[in-house]
């Protein structure tokens, strides 16, 4: 969950473990099950499950699959993150050293998917996902990326599912271009 305050330029990322047992909304009839199983009933069931869990309204969603994630990272020219534990990913066999690392799309996908090699498993995976999301936000809100907004949207339009109207996206881009400044991202 990403909570954005445009006035203060602060973003809060909230990660819920995929294996958390929660009442699954809609088709799940509020029976407790793993959060990841909410997706069986569709995007709305996932959204309603999280809304019920946290007592919030989620205005918009963006759904990316692996292909759209790879495209996004490629369109941004990769992302830079700090990796706090060395590991080799089971998914792609790539090695991730401790320290500041640049991730191309394949490396980024392995970084956000890995859990088995990490000390705290899914918890560490969630933190790695937040690191990559933070890096994406920093790149996407930069003047350079905003000026290339059309190319990024064109590159992703067939592979990202969202309920955010295009005019809202344009308004967000224009607001960021006019106000400038970086967002502070916390978890």
What residue spans do the PLM features occupy?
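Non-catalytic, solvent-exposed segments at the cell envelope interface
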Residues: 2-187
């Amino acid at each position: 969950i990403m909570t954005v305050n445009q006035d203060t330029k602060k973003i809060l990322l909230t990660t819920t473990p995929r294996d958390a047992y929660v009442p699954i909304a809609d088709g799940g009839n509020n029976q407790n099950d793993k959060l990841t199983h909410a997706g069986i009933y569709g995007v709305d069931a996932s959204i309603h499950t999280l809304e019920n869990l946290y007592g919030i309204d989620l205005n918009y969603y963006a759904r990316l699959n692996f292909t759209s994630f790879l495209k996004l990272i490629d369109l941004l020219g990769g992302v830079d993150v700090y990796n706090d534990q060395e590991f080799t990913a089971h998914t792609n066999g790539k090695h991730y050293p401790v320290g500041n690392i640049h991730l191309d799309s394949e490396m980024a996908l392995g970084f956000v998917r890995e859990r088995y090699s990490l000390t705290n498993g899914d918890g560490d995976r969630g933190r790695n996902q937040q690191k990559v999301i933070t890096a994406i936000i920093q790149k996407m809100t930069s003047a350079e990326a905003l000026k290339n907004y059309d190319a990024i949207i064109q590159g992703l339009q067939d592979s990202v599912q969202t309920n955010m109207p295009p005019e809202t996206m344009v308004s967000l881009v224009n607001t960021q271009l006019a106000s400038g400044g970086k967002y502070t991202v916390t978890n």
